[in-house]
């Protein structure tokens, strides 16, 4: 089917859905039609803009052929033709991007998990830096950042930390952050001024609702124990810490941040549901023809994706060969948009090649 025929078909479908919604349908039929109609709104707006530019270009070319035009009018028409001819490829690309298959999880909120990797205490300190960077980015975007759990080292580092980030399209923005982040800097305890390299792992999971993942009580094993602080000492006398294991998948989540066992259980279930949902998404995507490996930000947590070099003041993303020499703005102020937008654009470009 030709590109123009495909666009006409989409416009017809949109119009028919609008007529259906106006006909007074109710119940599940109305819900289904409303959902389809809303999903098409963005692409239809882009198609109409593209068709309008094509029509205006055709009119301008026809007008140019008319006899008796003065030089000023002819120059004005040629300027318009030049502008329209330059805008059409961009408008066509915007339509094609809007037509790309959507990741159902893109519109969801997210759970982010940061874990210290190789590098000992320096890695734990870097994990804390990354976690705080994402918190500041969430604040800049107007998202709600709720800390779920932090396992600290007692001197400012995080062995691991997790948070729920709520807002529109959070997962679509943050999903490319999954992977190994490497830091190169001189630790405060380094007397010789030598640069040390350490790493932390980031995992970004779409936050799953109960409607996405149904977890049966019979599939859970819940253990309770006393919470412990740094050094292993018990910090309270009740069994408030919770460990939940999803028996079918073997996925386990342990939480002890809250003094209330009930709150720890609720947070642990939230993380567990997100991990199970992400595992199911991964399996489905691997079954599809589109290999995850062929896309930017595959989400492979063993993939080294970014290096933060403090002595040189640079942050380099290895997937798209983008280096920014403003490490403080990125790390301390959470200004991640240049990386986020570049990764999304690169992902879209690769998908367009597959059409």
Swiss-Prot record:
It comes from the Bacteria. The keyword Glycoprotein does not apply. The keyword Cytoplasm applies. It holds the Pfam family RF-1. Residues 280-293 have a biased composition (Basic and acidic residues). Methylated by PrmC. Methylation increases the termination efficiency of RF1. Residues 280-308 are annotated as: Disordered. Keywords: Cytoplasm, Methylation, Protein biosynthesis. One of its GO terms (molecular function) is translation release factor activity, codon specific. One of its GO terms (cellular component) is cytoplasm. InterPro entries: PCRF, Pep_chain_release_fac_I, Pep_chain_release_fac_I_sf, Prokaryotic/Mito_RF, RF-1. It is found in: Cytoplasm. The modification N5-methylglutamine is found at residue 233. Belongs to the prokaryotic/mitochondrial release factor family. Peptide chain release factor 1 directs the termination of translation in response to the peptide chain termination codons UAG and UAA. PANTHER family: LD18447P (PTHR43804:SF7). This is Peptide chain release factor 1.
